[in-house]
């Protein structure tokens, strides 16, 4: 069965602006459970991870806000957005003047969401479904990471790859509300925001969320 991922994204979301970044419009779900179930039905699988692409997570919102408020962070730079989800952070980077953005996510629904969201915001991104953590670090100036330290294995792989990037002189910025495996001892806080989020996804309606630099 061939799945039209873009059609699924459009059919199961509404065009909304994340609370912290009203400049950006994304195809987002109103509730977590219905779209989660529909994703499982569409793929004929159960036990799938949440459709991360369908929500504006706290870390991504904070990182997007920081990029938009401090455009010199990305101005004229080659940027990678790791584990892009909706593509929100990459879109923010292009809006703030990045030379280029490569948005990466292994979920094909995410790839479709990034495409439709980029068009919605009139920006052009490069997109890949390759797992960049298994690849050599690309020749870029900046890597942006939102909300990727929620699971130990992923967090360890991510940090090792980001440390390789840092060793090459690449700047690394991370948006995170204090997930369990965030390596705070390796990070320098550069900004902090109170981010409105969904109780479907989080344990509070407002998450204190920081932007960190790998130090």
Language-model features, listed with the residues they occupy:
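S-adenosylmethionine-dependent methyltransferases
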Residues: 1-215
